[in-house]
Amino acid sequence: WTKEDGWKDARIVPEGPITMDPACVTLHYAQETFEGMKAYRTAEGKIQLFRPEMNAKRMINSNARLCMPEFPVDMFVEAVKALVKVEEDWVPSEPETSLYIRPFMFATEAALGVHMASAYKFMIICCPVGAYYAEGINPVKILVEDELVRAVKGGTGFTKCGGNYAGSILGQVKAEKMGYSQVLWLDGEHRKYVEEVGTMNIMFKIAGEIY
């Protein structure tokens, strides 16, 4: 994407290293976003995606917060489907396995100084994966983090950008050293209200009600 031409030159190429200028805006000011989704192979051998348009819409919201151009929903879904079609032999069929798909977008302009970049790339990589946790689908131990915070009101907590995850690594390392698999983050102001768990959804069943 460039200011002059918009999105252009879509293509599928073999995976390999990419070249970046040392002054690339992304390396200094973290103007990048990403998504995470999976393709599954059914018992009948059919390959299925789960609501890819929702991932596309979430990326649009993330991009807006970071002053990055919108990548249209139809182009996003088309790109994902095209890549999965090419790599369909890599979609595993064993229980608890899938093809992990990582769409991401980043600024490519080479310039120092905080500003909205004038050029971006949207890319997708993928690979077969097993269960995310060593415990599989069994219960995992979660540490309630009451010192560090992941998101604050008015911040970027609702976006999928690298800075959010870089800021959460210290809490994750702390949890793992104590024998936990993940972190339950509390609110940034009072440190007592449940916000989220780092890599999964969370819900509570209280007196028969699901929250």
List each model region and its residues:
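Helix-start/capping segments and mature chain N-termini
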Residues: W1-L83, L112-Y211
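Short, glycine/charge-rich beta-strand/loop segments that flank catalytic centers
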Residues: P72-L83, P92-E109
